[in-house]
């Protein structure tokens, strides 16, 4: 489908909506939608996402925002889709599919990935996306007290600027696509830990401000033991603060580790793909997402 084949206007309930590309001055519109659908994004979080992707807004005749959708190109043949929001009063009336079709047309030829809420799952399924994995959102106020013993073959140290090239390579192996622009933006606003083997980085975890507090991610590690060793120092530094992690890992021991720290089960989303499966079959895996929108 060509983008020019999709109408720039559509009737949504009593409104005639017009779609236009997202512009630099649309922060207020996009953040307004986040608040309307009860997403935790602060204005700073939306600003970061807008700097990394492109997308569309649907607005009515008096410039009220009705829906949004974004995509984030990573390398030459892959993209993440996210920030798909529709004003609560207009959900199920077709605005989401209308914008999704525009994004799919823009991304023709790319393998695509997204993380679907329960409410949006059927929309993406109808567009040809297939489920890949469940992502567990864990969050809470970090408790004071001992964590379960963490045993890893690699020592862990604080992330240094000189690590960044090696961390990009690790992330590409785990994620399945090159996303230098995303990582560089995250490095600029994050702290982190690095697992070291034979003097070289073997895994890493980042933490940054997001939503109600801070989010841990991405976390890239060889195994669960390395992932917990990377995360543990970040938890200890943030006792009494709100943290979140979004993870594929569903092992009882990993959940027990997070439970002990106060990061309780909150919600799940479904990772879905259109095109070939990427990542997950190399020496390192993603144990924590950078964000639902960025993977």
What residue ranges belong to the model's regions?
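Conserved GNAT acetyl-CoA-binding A-motif
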Residues: 105-118, 239-249, 269
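Active-site/acyl-donor-binding loops of N-acyltransferases
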Residues: 2-6, 122, 127-146, 208, ...
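Active-site rim helix/loop that mediates acceptor-substrate recognition in acyltransferases
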Residues: 7-10, 24-70, 172-192, 196
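Glycine/small-residue-rich hydrophobic helix-like segments
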Residues: 201-257
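Amide-forming acyltransferase catalytic core, primarily the GNAT-like/NAT-type
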Residues: 129-215, 225
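A short beta-loop-alpha structural element at the N-terminal edge
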Residues: 16-29, 154-166
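Conserved acetyl-CoA-binding loop-helix of GNAT-fold acetyltransferases
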Residues: 86, 92-105, 126, 223-236, ...
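Conserved beta-strand in the GNAT
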Residues: 57, 63-72, 78-85, 194, ...
């Amino acid at each position: 489908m060509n983008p020019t084949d999709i109408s720039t206007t559509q009737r949504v309930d009593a409104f005639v909506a017009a779609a236009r590309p997202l512009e630099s001055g649309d922060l207020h519109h996009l953040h307004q939608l986040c608040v309307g659908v009860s997403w935790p994004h602060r204005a700073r979080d939306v600003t970061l996402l807008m700097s990394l992707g492109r997308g569309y807004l649907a607005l009515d005749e008096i410039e009220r925002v009705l829906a949004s959708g974004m995509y984030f190109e990573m390398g030459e043949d892959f993209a993440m889709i996210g920030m798909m929001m529709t004003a609560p009063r207009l959900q199920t009336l077709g605005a989401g599919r209308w914008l999704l079709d525009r994004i799919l047309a823009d991304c023709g030829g790319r393998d695509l990935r997204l993380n679907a809420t329960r409410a949006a799952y059927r929309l993406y399924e109808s567009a040809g996306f297939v489920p890949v994995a469940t992502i567990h959102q864990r969050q809470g106020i970090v408790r004071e007290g001992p964590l379960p013993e963490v045993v890893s073959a690699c020592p862990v140290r604080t992330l240094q600027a000189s690590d960044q090239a090696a961390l990009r390579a690790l992330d590409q192996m785990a994620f399945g696509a090159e996303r230098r622009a995303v990582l560089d933006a995250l490095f600029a606003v994050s702290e982190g830990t690095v697992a070291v083997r034979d003097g070289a980085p073997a895994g890493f975890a980042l933490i940054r401000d997001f939503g109600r507090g801070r989010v841990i991610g991405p976390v890239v590690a060889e195994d669960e033991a390395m992932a917990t060793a990377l995360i543990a120092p970040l938890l200890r530094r943030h006792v009494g603060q709100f943290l979140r992690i979004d993870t594929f890992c569903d092992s009882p021991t990993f959940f027990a580790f997070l439970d002990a720290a106060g990061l309780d089960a909150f919600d799940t989303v479904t990772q879905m793909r259109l095109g070939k499966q990427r990542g997950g079959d190399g020496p390192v895996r993603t144990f924590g997402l950078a964000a639902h929108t960025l993977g």
